[in-house]
């Protein structure tokens, strides 16, 4: 790497003024890009899909958009408290209930695999795009 300790401290100060800074080894930067650099688009796609599903169930688009925006805000606030997402999911999923029925479909459709492959593809693309810099 060509960055000095002073460069790192400057970047941390600038970026830290608008958010949390996590320092990772240079070898992990492509994975970070694939996960959180592309992550907002993954979440926006989930929001789009939920909005489309709500409309397909007969809800008005403007109502659906408001509900899904608030769903993401509320869910993000809960995540920000530091609780494990698995525990949060369990706390809102009653056995045999409506949420459990929906989760079963998502798991059967391999949602975890889809996200893992998306992160892997974005990570690999980051490696390709950055290859000329190494």
PLM feature spans:
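Short pre-catalytic strand/loop immediately N-terminal to key active-site residues, enriched for Gly-Thr
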Residues: 28-34, 85-90
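Aromatic-residue-lined binding/catalytic grooves and analogous aromatic/hydrophobic interfacial grooves
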Residues: 39
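NAD(P)-dependent Rossmann-like dehydrogenase/reductase catalytic/cofactor-binding core
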Residues: 66-134
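Internal alpha-helical scaffold of NAD(P)-dependent oxidoreductase catalytic cores
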Residues: 1-31, 42-81, 125
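Catalytic, metal-anchored helix/loop core of enzyme active sites in primary metabolism
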Residues: 35, 47, 132
